A protein has these predicted regions:
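RNA-interacting cores
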Residues: 1-250
Length: 250
């Protein structure tokens, strides 16, 4: 089971909180966990937490979205985040005014959700800086191949029992995807001593696929708001929301 939590933060007046502070929030979170849990997370190649920080114009609020991508981390982290009242960062304490907890979902539920759509158009909105690594270099445009590879890798990490490993099916899926519209801007995500080339904005993808492959693609899209897209989703990058047709993911 995976789960999404959203913490509404209230920075003190005059304090600007950049999106890169997501990395500091993650450091605070790791410090709150039992030592054995934190050590286990650091040893894993793909961390079971994807999170990001963004300002919501609709809600006029700063929101920290935290996705817990396996049952062990969900049981450890969810009670901690639902009870926190303030996050004491060195730069400034951040009061938590609200915590919204989405129901936990399974891979089977996401797959069923994918089957409930016959629309072939989806919009992905990248709320925090997103990037890919290709041939050892940063790629700052969401090509269809890179989108699919990223979503599949994150899915396989979260749901190894439902791993997508059929190369022929994935190739057919890739060949049926087409970015038909985009509204993107380049940016940089400061991380330690590096400023990672990245992008934010939105893309619209059309899928010309046989029904079984369209269901698979829609399941991956429904997972995107949890697993994120691209690299360093554990450090605040790649925060994504998605709408399929006129309806969003669960």
């Amino acid at each position: 089971m995976i789960q999404q939590l959203q913490l509404v933060l209230a920075p003190p007046t005059g304090v600007r909180v950049p999106q890169a502070w997501a990395y500091r929030l993650y450091g605070w979170l790791m410090a709150q966990l039992p030592a054995d849990v934190g050590d286990a997370l650091h040893l894993q190649g793909e961390h079971p937490i994807a999170h990001f920080l963004h300002f919501s114009p609709e809600k006029q609020a700063l929101i920290w979205t935290v996705n817990l991508l396996n049952e062990t981390v969900r049981q450890s982290v969810s009670p901690l985040l639902t009870s926190v009242k303030e996050i004491p960062l060195h730069e400034s304490p951040l009061p938590v005014t609200e915590v919204h907890v989405s129901p936990a979902v399974s891979a089977a539920e996401l797959i069923r959700f994918g089957r409930s759509f016959d629309e072939n158009r989806a919009k992905l909105v990248f709320l925090s800086p997103c990037a890919f690594k290709q041939s050892g270099r940063y790629a700052i445009f969401p090509q269809e191949t890179l989108l699919l590879q990223s979503l599949t890798a994150h899915w396989n990490t979260a749901f190894p029992e439902y791993a997508l490993t059929d190369d022929d099916a994935l190739l057919a899926l890739q060949q049926g995807l087409h970015i038909v519209d985009y509204n993107l801007r380049t940016t940089r995500y400061p991380l330690k001593e590096t400023r990672i080339p990245s992008f934010q904005g939105s893309v619209t993808v059309e899928a010309h696929l046989a029904p079984p492959l369209l269901e698979l693609w829609n399941a991956l899209l429904s997972f995107a708001p949890y697993g994120g897209v691209g690299i360093k989703t554990t450090l605040g990058m790649g925060g994504t929301v998605c709408s399929i047709g006129r309806t969003g993911a669960p």
